[in-house]
UniProtKB/Swiss-Prot annotation:
Source organism of the structure: Trimeresurus stejnegeri (Chinese green tree viper)
Location, primary (coarse class): secreted
Family: Belongs to the snaclec family.
Self-association and partners: Heteromultimer; disulfide-linked.
Swiss-Prot/TrEMBL keywords: Disulfide bond, Hemostasis impairing toxin, Secreted, Signal, Toxin
GO cellular component, one term: extracellular region
Function: Interferes with one step of hemostasis (modulation of platelet aggregation, or coagulation cascade, for example).
Protein name: Snaclec stejaggregin-B subunit alpha
Paired cysteines (S-S): 25-36, 53-150, 125-142
Residue span(s) of domain C-type lectin: 32-151
Tissue distribution of the protein: Expressed by the venom gland.
Signal sequence range: 1-23
Annotated effect of mutating residue 154 to G: In subunit alpha-4
Length: 156
C-alpha cells in the first residue's frame, strides 16, 4: 500500500510540474507565456520559411517578438540550440509596401510594439544575428537562406 501511494504521489508531482510549462506544446516545441516556439535548422528563404511554419501547425508563423522579455527568451533558445556561427535566424518581421509608404509588419499580423533594429531599412526581411547573441535585428535580402524559428499561440 505504501509503495502504491508513493508511486501515485510521484506521478502527481510530475503531472503538476508539467502543466503550465511546455506541456501544452508539441513535444519538440518550447513554451513561453501563451506561445510555443520551434527552431528549424534548415536553410530557407524568408518566404519559404514562413510557408514551412504555416504548414507545421495551424496558426504558426515565423517568430514575432513583442517584448524585451520575449526577445531574451528567443535569444536564449537560439544561443543554446544553434551552435554554428555561419547562419543567422529569420524572424517574422518584414517591410511591406503600401502605396507610397512602407511599414514593418509581423507575418502573424501582430503589431510591432517592440523593436531592436540595427541597420536602416534598405532590404525587406529581418534576421537575428548570431554575432549579437541573437539579440539584434538586421535588415537583409529576403532571398538569402537562413535558419528560422516558428511560433504559434498555444491551445487552451
Amino acid at each position: 500500500m505504501g509503495r502504491f501511494i508513493s508511486v501515485s504521489f510521484g506521478l502527481l508531482v510530475v503531472f503538476l510540474s508539467l502543466s503550465g510549462t511546455g506541456a501544452d506544446c508539441p513535444s519538440d516545441w518550447s513554451s513561453f507565456k501563451q506561445y510555443c516556439y520551434q527552431i528549424i535548422k534548415q536553410l530557407k528563404t524568408w518566404e519559404d520559411a514562413e510557408r514551412f511554419c504555416m504548414d507545421q501547425v495551424k496558426g504558426a508563423h515565423l517568430v514575432s517578438i513583442e517584448s524585451y522579455r520575449e526577445a531574451v527568451f528567443v535569444a536564449q533558445q537560439l544561443s543554446e540550440n544553434v551552435k554554428t556561427t555561419k547562419y543567422d535566424v529569420w524572424i517574422g518581421l518584414s517591410v511591406v509596401n503600401k502605396g507610397q509608404q512602407c511599414s514593418s509588419e509581423w507575418s502573424d499580423g501582430s503589431s510591432v510594439s517592440y523593436e531592436n533594429l540595427v541597420k536602416p531599412l534598405s532590404k525587406k526581411c529581418f534576421v537575428l544575428k548570431k554575432g549579437t547573441e541573437f539579440r539584434k535585428w538586421f535588415n537583409v535580402a529576403c532571398e538569402q537562406k537562413h535558419l528560422f524559428m516558428c511560433k504559434f499561440l498555444r491551445p487552451r
